[in-house]
């Protein structure tokens, strides 16, 4: 099972542009459910509770991600994937850590692709991080080399298909 597990509901799909849930934010940010709920309590994250679940518009999520109290925490979580990979001297199996910087791309489309594929593909030994750095999307993948390379290859195949249309 991957670290950031998300089951996308049909009526509140991450890719529909309507709402994000807390579980979506944990996947995107790497922050824990509890940390995100603390940001809600502090008023840093705004949302609406519907049927017992917090819902956030894309605008609310973007404002949250850009908040000066939140962004450093997210960056620390993302960078921890790389630091942990380098610091771990005894690995139980082969592992790979890849940082993919994609300048001048549709950042939302990149995030959606990786979130969707990780949650709907056969990826069980992979850790994922995404950040938008200026005009660049940054994807960090860590885990089983076969899974990491498969996911990267799928992204480039999809990217080539979309660019040729």
Regions found by a protein language model. Give the residues of each.
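Mid-protein regulatory/catalytic core that forms ligand/cofactor-binding pockets
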Residues: 88-165
